[in-house]
Amino acid sequence: MIVVVAPGQGSQTPGFLEPWIAEPRFREHLQRISDSVGIDLVKHGTTSDEDTIRDTAIAQPLIVAAGLLAFEGLVPDNGKLAIGGVAGHSVGEITASVLSGILSEEEAFRFVKQRSQGMADAAALVRTGMSAVIGGDEDALLTHLKDLDLEPANFNGGGQIVVAGELTKLAKLAENPLPGTRVIPLKVAGAFHTHYMEPSVAALHEVAASIWASDPLLPIWTNRDGSLVESGTTFVDLMVSQVTSPVRWDLTMVALSAAGVTGLIELAPAGALVGLARRGLKGVPTVAIKTPDDLAAAHDMMNGK
């Protein structure tokens, strides 16, 4: 079973869409998305600097758009994809919801526009951020986080937990890491997937209630607990609550393994989830789609080559 996964925030880099817009069909697609959300994603994906695309109001629609461009390149001429399911990490769940048929592209960008702006507004209230903690004992780390008034935001598997909170408290964690751990500050603009995002929930819930969600045509796993979700409405509700809840990518990988995954394709901007799969899904072949040149390898995987 081949699974397609979509990355979350922090995977974007300056100019990463440059190779994509060199092809007219991808440039036209990106321009349509830009027009629909009122954000110049062509500019932000090609010439905007690192600080600009760190802004979550820009980063989220940019990442979802990139994933959909890559997915467009995956779909063969006959429209039949040889994949067994989809999943997304954080905002990547919105990408996955389009892939599975839960949301139309238009509805997905209505949702991500509200999600990104609401989370940006919430992040502006308090100076917060996120750091990855590599290694160490999970229980000891969680206890240490409570002592520092920090929260776990992503359980990524393979010994990596992303923590979030006020910048001063993250600095204390970095200054005094637990034995056997490394602390790496992340290039994101807030404490996502924590209580700091609570101010964004009400408006996002209103948008979610106004959009049409179909039941998935492809199996889709949720970040909440790694379970398969069969109701489109339920999946959208989970995406709303996810903004204040930890991403359980570790449980998602456990579920993929149990489902018999034999190959994993990560959509653009790829790299992070393939890296996690090397530790959490050992032995499973992967393809990271970073540019259109990587599509051939993804097609080969889907065709069993």
Language-model features and meaning:
Residues 1-140, 186, 263-293:
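FabD-like malonyl-/acyl-CoA
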Residues 9-11, 37, 49, 100-244:
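Alpha/beta catalytic cores of group-transfer enzymes, especially the acyltransferase/condensing modules
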Residues 227, 246, 270-272:
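Short Gly/Pro-enriched loop/turn and capping motifs at secondary-structure junctions
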Residues 257-260:
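Non-catalytic positions within long, well-ordered alpha-helices that form the structural scaffold/packing
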